Amino acid sequence: MVSHKKNDRPRPLWILKIHKRLSLFEFKRYATGIGKDDGQDISWVLKGNAKNNVYQVTVETMENCETDECKKVIWVPDELAESTGTMFEDFKEDQPQESVSSISNNEANWGSSVNELDENYEKMQKEETFDPYDSDSDTSEDSDFDEDFEDSDKTMCSGQS
């Protein structure tokens, strides 16, 4: 039997616009203030390998393609923003790096020490169940299909019908 699971996360096709750049340290302060209800997905940063900076970008998603509903704001690590080529270079020239001081007090976790920020960030990484880099997180079929396929493959290989 094939069972299906519904993935409610949008699947980005490409970056349309780069809005903001934060250092990874400053993002750790900001990330604690981003709620799941505001539509800004941070799983790409939490599960990615951000080295220096992270970027707030608008992406076009596979869902409702070519409509306003397909545009989502997400945060991505530097390597994904850099992959936009000319758009990234233009952004880098035109936009200074944001700092936490340019973000409202409500969005930043101001009272945290560096160790506390790192601990909170690691906790957020562990609590994030969706991994956008894992192909299994993006499929519409779960392991029941894989087991059925493996069973039928074994039957075919053994010559049984």
From Swiss-Prot:
- Domain of life here? Eukaryota
Per its record, what are the GO molecular function terms? protein phosphatase 1 binding
For this chain the motif PP1 binding motif maps to: 72-75
Q: Where is the composition biased (Polar residues)?
A: 97-115
Gene Ontology BP terms:
establishment of meiotic sister chromatid cohesion; maintenance of meiotic sister chromatid cohesion; negative regulation of protein localization to nucleus; positive regulation of protein localization to nucleus
What binding partners and quaternary form does the record give? Interacts with gsp-1 and gsp-2; the interaction is direct.
Protein's job: Involved in sister chromatid cohesion during mitosis and meiosis. In association with the gsp-2 phosphatase, it both restricts the localization and antagonizes the function of the air-2 kinase during meiosis I and mitosis to promote chromatid cohesion and spindle attachment. This in turn, drives germ cell immortality. Furthermore, may play a role in ensuring the timely assembly of the synaptonemal complex during prophase I of meiosis.
- Designated name of the protein: Long arms of the bivalent protein 1
